[in-house]
From Swiss-Prot:
Belongs to the UPF0053 family. Hemolysin C subfamily. Coiled coil: none annotated. This is Hemolysin C. Keywords: CBS domain, Cytolysis, Hemolysis, Repeat, Toxin, Virulence. It comes from Rickettsia felis (strain ATCC VR-1525 / URRWXCal2) (Rickettsia azadi). The keyword Repeat applies. It comes from the Bacteria. One of its GO terms (biological process) is killing of cells of another organism. The keyword Cell inner membrane does not apply. Transmembrane segments: none annotated. Residues 80-142, 145-202 form the CBS domain. GO terms for molecular function: flavin adenine dinucleotide binding; toxin activity.
Length: 299
């Protein structure tokens, strides 16, 4: 996902150094294997053999190998940030206007730029380019700061996307649907986290602490993208059937209502559960309040 850029540069450098050391250590036996043998072998076959003979590996190294194996079958659709969660800026935005807006909130490291609508993404800007332009008192529009992105389909394999990003020398891919509209985005950080696991920074930790809060015995505040299984585990009640196509609490609400309900709408999910919409846009749910009529101890 798009990351916060302040106060975390040094910690990310340390994480990157550890990542490089671990990856080098892991891939050393793979390199040696291909040097010693002339027999054609599948890359993932080698990794599977390494995983089997991994007694000398640490838990982190084993986890990375396991993630690499899973990566073989994963597609962009599995990890992309959905359109409703994309933060973007209009191409016509003035640099001075943007500088005023970022004083009020933590800026992203990279932000998409669109012309007209989000279906026409023209590229992205890096926050360091913006700060440099502001420091040198460059006036005008964002156009001269725009960097290129790549286009990808939801069905594209993650390894293919990683290779394409490397060839094109860019860190952002816009995911488009069959009609050419913007469906989501994937960043290089998303791909790295699929291999090494989630890399938290201070901003992520703050977001996580607000994602799912048990306020008291009868009230829970939740991000709409939290998995239904999390709520089921807390309350001890089954909310999703095997044939249901949703995975999140927001999906549960949308399935019951049939559309995006307005803020303040209350939906009876079961005899014990009522969900109130506390934050939403015309296209998606953001946050809900879950009321347990019989309390958490009812299970």
């Amino acid at each position: 996902m798009l990351k916060s850029s302040k106060k975390e540069d040094s910690s990310k450098k340390n994480q990157n150094n550890k990542l490089i050391f671990t990856v080098r250590k892991l891939f050393s036996p793979i390199k040696n294997f291909f040097r010693k043998t002339k027999t054609p072998d599948n890359f993932f076959g080698v990794i599977k053999r390494l995983k089997i003979n991994s007694q000398k590996m640490t838990l982190d190294e084993r986890n990375i190998l396991a993630n690499l194996l899973e990566l073989e079958d994963k597609t962009i659709e599995d990890i992309m940030v959905p359109r409703s969660d994309i933060a973007a800026i209009k191409l016509t935005t003035n640099l001075e206007e943007l500088s005023e807006s970022i004083k009020l909130e933590v800026p992203h490291t990279r932000t998409l730029i669109y012309d007209g609508t989000l279906d026409n993404v023209v590229g992205f800007i890096h926050i360091k380019d913006l700060f440099k332009a502001l420091a040198t008192k460059q006036n005008g529009r964002l156009k001269k700061l725009i960097r290129k992105h790549i286009i990808a389909a939801p069905s594209m394999k993650l390894l293919d996307l990683l290779a394409k990003m490397r060839r094109e020398r860019t860190h952002i891919a816009i995911v488009v649907d069959e009609y050419g509209g913007t469906d989501g985005l994937v960043t290089i950080e998303d791909l790295i986290e699929e291999i090494v696991g989630r890399i938290d920074d201070e901003h992520d930790q703050q977001l996580d602490s607000d994602n799912f809060k048990v306020i008291n015995n009868s009230t829970i505040i939740s991000n709409a993208r939290v998995e239904v299984e999390v709520l089921e585990e807390i309350i001890g009640e089954k909310l999703k059937n095997d044939d249901d196509e949703f995975d999140t609490i927001g999906g549960l609400v949308l399935t019951r209502v049939g559309s995006v309900p307005a803020i303040g709408t209350r939906i009876d999910i079961s005899e014990n559960i009522e969900i109130e919409v506390t934050d939403a846009t015309p296209r998606s749910l953001k946050q809900v309040k879950i009321r347990l009529k019989n309390g958490l101890n009812s299970k």
